[in-house]
Amino acid sequence: MLQGTGSDVGKSVLVAGLCRALVQRGLRVLPFKPQNMSNNAAVTSDGGEIGRAQALQAIACKVEPHTDMNPVLLKPQADRTSQLIVHGRVRGTLGAGNFRQARGALLGEVLASYNRLRRACDIVVVEGAGSPAEINLRAGDIANMGFARAAGVPVVLVGDIDRGGVIAAIVGTRTIIDPADTAMIQGFIINKFRGDPALFADGYAQIESLSGWRGFGVVPWLSAAARLPSEDAVVLESGKARAESRKLIACPILPRISNFDDLDPLKLEHGVDLHMVPPGQPIPAEAALIILPGSKSTIADLAALRAEGWDIDIFAHHRRGGLILGLCGGYQMLGKSIADPDGFEGSASAASGLGLLDVETTLHAHKALRPVSGLAMGAPFQGYEMHMGQTNGPDTEQPFAVFADGRRDGAINAGGTVFGSYVHGLLADAELRRALLSRMDVEAGGVDYGASVEAALDEIAAALEEHLDIDALVALAMAERPASVPAGDSA
């Protein structure tokens, strides 16, 4: 199990890379994360949802994503509330304090998922969340040491040297955590090193001496990781330097933005710049396309959009004939109204939309979770639905997409410049991307996004084989586990 000295130390990428490296060695491997908190989710083969990182790790293992790979998923809706997903299904909404009290009761379900995976493969590579050093969260923990001790899984601690202070982070973690938790840690990995690793030899030895743990290696900065789907909001930034020769695509960063990995394929296109617009900045007037992304709290994010003045920028863009694409929550915002009579996003509420599509949305209890395929803009696509709303109105008579089963999705305005769709993953298909970019007079490169992700995973796996003692990690993972595994083995 990889745990970190903090968030964003690179655990997700390391797990994905290790999964691919072990698969290439001929082992049957599966990923697992007991508890994740993310608004970037993926639909699984068994019709549920899990964190995007675990779906990527499944790809690295060359298997279909399954809800057992991430049994507990928290999707933040507001500063103090999250939607609770257990085994891929919505179980309710919890406040921060409620979850801290309730999470211990979920340990049995977490262990049930882990044990099913363990029986189905040679090695389960587990990813922790945040850090075990957050000792204020230790009681009832199911994400890090609470799980590791219950399941008897050895832990390797990951430290991020790029942010500085890695010696203190690793040695400090050892100092403050419970001795029984310390006993679970079998070593450490230094991640995100830039330059010659030999320059850190003394520091590496000092960590080994001060912690009493062995080091498994120093991983360099992995540039290939930038080509993988994004999960954490910390990566929201422009993909490359601006150039006047490239058309600009702008996307505002909403407070509860979700599934923003929808936009990742655009980073591969040399004819466009994807600019993620942070709060406090206007949407650039030179944008050829504005994309309104998914949202976990659509009405609140629509209010935030207006508070930033982005609605004014969007209306001006529309008057100039610019293109606008709304995805899921962004699609709902483009309509005339959004109603949440039963308070699925918090308290019961309603809001006027931007009115650029003649449609109205009502949120309801049923959550659509399914893979879909069909035609959009004359091009084939594959993607998935993940939403809790029903949208109707005159503009749906000109749908954005028609599914293979004949169902219609989304809407297009009468002028043919505003598009809305509930489908995530649309832009991963090269032909659809080409059709959209041609509306901007941009010739798409036809890059196979899926192949690009596969190549990036192979590159990362090769780097880990070179810089980590994977033989020792395999031996650690294959070592005999405790004779009895706690509750959940047969659930």
From Swiss-Prot:
CDD domains: CobQ_N, GATase1_CobQ. Keywords: Cobalamin biosynthesis, Glutamine amidotransferase. Residues 246-432 form the GATase cobBQ-type domain. One of its GO terms (biological process) is cobalamin biosynthetic process. It comes from the Bacteria. Pathway: Cofactor biosynthesis; adenosylcobalamin biosynthesis. PROSITE patterns: GATASE_COBBQ. Gene3D superfamilies: 3.40.50.880, P-loop containing nucleotide triphosphate hydrolases. Coiled coil: none annotated. InterPro entries: Class_I_gatase-like, CobQ/CobB/MinD/ParA_Nub-bd_dom, CobQ_GATase1, CobQ_N, CobQ_synth, GATase_3, P-loop_NTPase. HAMAP family: CobQ (MF_00028). This is Cobyric acid synthase. It comes from Novosphingobium aromaticivorans (strain ATCC 700278 / DSM 12444 / CCUG 56034 / CIP 105152 / NBRC 16084 / F199).
